[in-house]
A protein has these predicted regions:
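Charge-biased low-complexity segments
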Residues: 1-123
Length: 123
């Protein structure tokens, strides 16, 4: 039986979970004002070349909401087209700070996936 085994980080200090990224937490992160979809719709710029070529679809962006609410590690989880993927990353990187997620009352890092829909209107 092994007891009292601590998780030690790279330099020998005990890992307090500060670098751990959670998928689900007691209090999930929230976007300021609550409506991230509305904010994205207002701030996304449809790439001209994609528009001219009728390219549309849903880009899934993964990122980490840090303990201070900032956004890091932004990457495309599932892309559509290079220009749409690039714009989706840009708009996520430009988001304001979120209210961070909490576990046991303390702010923690939380992984988040956000779908961004690029759809051309039929005008």
């Amino acid at each position: 039986v092994i007891e009292n085994v601590a998780d030690f980080g790279e330099y020998g200090e005990e890992n307090t979970g500060e670098s751990e990224i959670f998928q689900v937490v007691e209090d999930m992160p929230s976007f300021p004002g609550g409506n991230v979809s509305k904010w994205i719709a207002k701030n996304v710029k449809y790439p001209v070349l994609a528009m001219e070529n009728g390219i549309q679809g849903k880009v899934f962006i993964q990122f980490v909401i840090e303990r201070d609410g900032s956004i890091t590690d932004v990457k495309v989880a599932r892309g559509v087209d290079a220009s749409l993927d690039k714009e989706a990353v840009r708009v996520v990187q430009s988001m304001p700070k979120w209210k961070p997620g909490k576990q046991i009352g303390k702010p923690v890092r939380v992984a988040y996936t956000l779908p961004i829909n690029f759809q051309l209107s039929n005008n």
